[in-house]
Amino acid sequence: MESLSLPVLNPLLASGSNLFRNQHSRMTSSMVSSLKSPIGGTSLSTVRRFGVGVVRMQAVDEDIDLKQMRDIAAAKKRWDGLLREGKVKLLTPREAGYAISLSNKPLLDVRPSSERNKAWIKGSTWVPIFDNDDNLDAGTLSKKVTSFAMGGWWSGAPTLSFNRLFLSKVEEKFPKDSELIVACQKGLRSLAACELLYNAGYENLFWVQGGLESAQDEDLVTEGVQPLKLAGIGGFSEFLGWTDQQRAQAAKEGWGYRLVYTARLFGVVLAADALFVGAQQLGHYIQELRGH
């Protein structure tokens, strides 16, 4: 378990965090440039000390980004090694479906609850390696606000935290000589789970390449309120139907499916227009009140 190094809980949050740091660096550098000449009672030595402090903050941010990149690269290298050396066997979604239906191999679903609750494989066992972080402490709230501001409102990607009970929960359900098919939505978290399980003594592991999202309708027997391909989307992009998964679904479903999202788009445009007109009218009303 200690060999797994996953500093980033989800890719969107990582990209949002980097964007935030870049904006922070630009803002602080502009502050330094504006303080090059002393203003009021501020001494030149104070400005220089402040500038040095900002430079150090930027250096720390860059070091964090570099460490994250190195850790991710190292993790991918380890995961590739597991597959290359045959320690974890690779299955396509169709092969996984055959193994489940013909050989009764268990499927371990390691997706977070936000994805699992939408669609799942019939008869699968659910133990998330990362799950939605519902804590209300200051650190978690800060992460959620940052994630939302940096694109979470559009993609609907939740804030996730590592499930420290993952291994113990799996060990409760499956002996270590079990043949386990491990799957997630896109394939990355399930590889991380395979590494944890292999290091814990599970040696008959099968990884679903591309995740459940890459499965065709006939590959696996599913249950839930949505198609399996749509379980990983969310946010405003899902509401408008502007995701690759929904476009692929629309190509199969036809115009009736597209009409729903077209109507939603028109509704959003009309609502935005009404808000704009209402704001203008309110502004005129306030000006008239001030004139009297």
Curated annotation (Swiss-Prot):
Name of the protein in its database record: Rhodanese-like domain-containing protein 11, chloroplastic
Cited Pfam families: Rhodanese (PF00581)
Database matches in SUPFAM superfamilies: Rhodanese/Cell cycle control phosphatase
Gene Ontology CC annotations of this record: chloroplast; cytosol
Keywords annotated in UniProt: Chloroplast, Plastid, Transit peptide
Domain Rhodanese: 101-224
Record flagged with keyword Ion transport: no
